């Protein structure tokens, strides 16, 4: 029996609350059509108080698995009977699947972050030092990716220093916490600068100047933002003006979807320019570029 036959009729989902904004159905729908797989992927809105019962009834509802987004990533971590290494390190689950009747959880955000940089800025992981702006939930996946790829020194800056200290304590050696006031001084020796804050994203002062001068960064430094709405954030615009190589956040969204699709439907999809243009067209239609 070939992979397409095995995947026939399989169902997967993305769940969050709210979920109407998700572009995951567009991504997976594109791959299902491209690969000729008779499966489905749907958005399912689940309230926080209903998540545990939803997770427990995946098999009964005919799902092979699915993606989990805000605010359910920690609840999915708690619900999973088995966790992959990335999920354990990050403390959150964004991908669920059933294996021999057991609910398994993984986290593909770190994979997606690194794969996006591999595709758009190959050699990025030669940087000895990285600067991560922000210490929210998303920054954990970024830090895990950096450590996994051998970055020697990761500086995390945050307006609330205790959040950065908590993150540094979680990951241990090679991760250092700093206050936001120290960010400017840290730019000068950072080979990779990652923005994980909401500064510059839609609804968070996207028209304003990013509050850090990037002109003193090493000329070979790479700057990337995990935000993809808008595609060109205030941070990326400033990095570009400073002459840095920039990588937008859309690729992270696309690449993080790959492992889950392969688990549910049995074929590994490719992140192509055609897929990117498909999502960009939807973003343009929604006025989200």
From Swiss-Prot:
It holds the Pfam family Shikimate_dh_N. This is Shikimate dehydrogenase (NADP(+)). The keyword Amino-acid biosynthesis applies. One of its GO terms (biological process) is shikimate metabolic process. Pathway: Metabolic intermediate biosynthesis; chorismate biosynthesis; chorismate from D-erythrose 4-phosphate and phosphoenolpyruvate: step 4/7. GO terms for molecular function: NADP binding; shikimate 3-dehydrogenase (NADP+) activity. Coiled coil: none annotated. It comes from Brucella abortus (strain 2308). It catalyses: shikimate + NADP(+) = 3-dehydroshikimate + NADPH + H(+). GO terms for cellular component: cytosol. Its EC number is 1.1.1.25. The lineage of its organism: Bacteria, Pseudomonadati, Pseudomonadota, Alphaproteobacteria, Hyphomicrobiales. Belongs to the shikimate dehydrogenase family. NADP(+) binds at residues 85, 134-138, 158-163, 226, 249. Keywords: Amino-acid biosynthesis, Aromatic amino acid biosynthesis, NADP, Oxidoreductase. InterPro entries: Aminoacid_DH-like_N_sf (IPR046346), NAD(P)-bd_dom_sf (IPR036291), SDH_C (IPR041121), Shikimate_DH (IPR011342), Shikimate_DH-bd_N (IPR013708), Shikimate_DH_fam (IPR022893), Shikm_DH/Glu-tRNA_Rdtase (IPR006151). The active site is at residue 73. Homodimer.
